[in-house]
Amino acid sequence: MTAEGEAKNPSAGGGGDNPQHQQAAPAPAPAQGEVAQEAAVQGTGQEQERDKADREVQGGAGEKDDGACRDLVLVEDPEVLAVEDPEEAAATAALQEEMKALVASIPDGAGAAFTAMQLQELEQQSRVYQYMAARVPVPTHLVFPVWKSVTGASSEGAQKYPTLMGLATLCLDFGKNPEPEPGRCRRTDGKKWRCWRNTIPNEKYCERHMHRGRKRPVQVFLEDDEPDSASGSKPAAPGKATEGAKKADDKSPSSKKLAVAAPAAVQST
């Protein structure tokens, strides 16, 4: 038994005596697990290449679409572009620097720098500044609160700023609610009707309603004696007419009574 085993596998025992036989021995077959792993790696590589190709195709289509959108959106007329004034840009930059310095000067944990009302007023003033920087007329509803805050701070405010920067020509009443339609006559019937005419400069009413409701002076005319049409004589002088009127007024009421009572006495007799 031992002899047969040695004959079948001569390399098992004393294999070191025959080196040529060791070189001719076949290599061991690879395991099944390694083969499956290599196949999985190859499959994943192919899937990655396919995904990459699909992405490139989609990216090319997206770039085409983006190019079309850019052609539609980014094309601007050079004549319409506004040219920024360097002075305004410098003023805006200086204002931003001042605000940053003010915010940086507030210590940590000191609380809010402004109250809610102050923040609201600051926002409103920034809107007014935006209109002024754009060289556009500032709306009146933004100017009125600022004017009221300035005039209400002291009794001299209304004297220093009585016309609100030249808006007195709009016939606006700064003591009450703002006028919704400046420049229109204020004459109304107390309900819904309102005059549609324009006002006189620096006034509240139009020419028709300017003197409405005021007492007008009564003009006194002296009536001269009527000339006789038949005789064609000239009318008497105004001096003579006044003298005759004075003589008529000088008659006492007693004489008038006697003149009226005389016929009654004659009838009784």
UniProtKB/Swiss-Prot annotation:
Domain QLQ: 113-148
Subcellular localization, as worded in the UniProt entry: Nucleus
Domain of life, per lineage: Eukaryota
Record-annotated WRC domain positions: 179-223
Position of sequence motif Bipartite nuclear localization signal: 184-194, 212-216
Compositionally biased region (Basic and acidic residues): 47-69, 243-253
Any GO molecular function: ATP binding
Keywords: Nucleus
Chain spans, region Disordered: 1-71, 217-269
Main localization (coarse): nucleus
Keyword Nucleus set for record: yes
Tissue distribution: Highly expressed in shoots. Expressed in developing leaves.
Biased segments, Low complexity type: 22-43
An example Gene Ontology biological process: DNA-templated transcription
Any single GO CC term annotated in Swiss-Prot or TrEMBL for this entry: nucleus
Note: Plants over-expressing GRF10 exhibit reduced leaf size and plant height.
Family recorded in the similarity comment: Belongs to the GRF family.
Function: Involved in the regulation of cell proliferation in developing shoots and leaves. Does not possess transactivation activity.
Domain notes: The QLQ domain and WRC domain may be involved in protein-protein interaction and DNA-binding, respectively.
Quaternary structure and interacting proteins, as annotated: Interacts with GIF1.
Protein name according to UniProt: GRF-interacting factor 10
Gene: GRF10
